[in-house]
Amino acid sequence: MKKYLFLCLLAAHPVHSFASDQLNGTVWKTIDDQTNQPRALVRFNEDKNGALSATIEKVLVPSEANKCSKCEGAYQNKSLVGLTIVKNLKSSGENKYTNGSILDPKTGKTYSFNATLSPDGKKLSGRGYIGISALGRSQTWYKVK
């Protein structure tokens, strides 16, 4: 019985690590869900605990404000480039990521965040929400080669 349990745990561990690795180090073009226009390039990185974060590397809208003027606290008036907008996103199975948070620099609001990676690894469908997911907003981001 102990051998069976050990083998099950051993087999499950690489799948979890691989799932996080699918996003780790990748760059994505964010698309505004209201205008359908590209907004920024963000890079995902994994911390020592396996949680993923995403940081803005480049703002794609020339007229976009360079600072997070509506953000509060430590993020107030911080440059958008270098701003971490996704935090604590964790792999929860094949191509699924949950329990994260996302900051909308346009409004300064933070939402709960879940995401699903497409089977071909080229699209990331994310949903930001407060309370229940049904009352949130969705965006699809596209992997940059």
What do these predicted ranges mean?
Residues M1, P14-S17, W141:
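Intrinsically disordered, glycine/charged-rich N-terminal periplasmic/extracytoplasmic linker segments
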Residues L7, S17, K67-K70:
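The N-terminal extracellular segments of secreted preproproteins, especially immediately downstream
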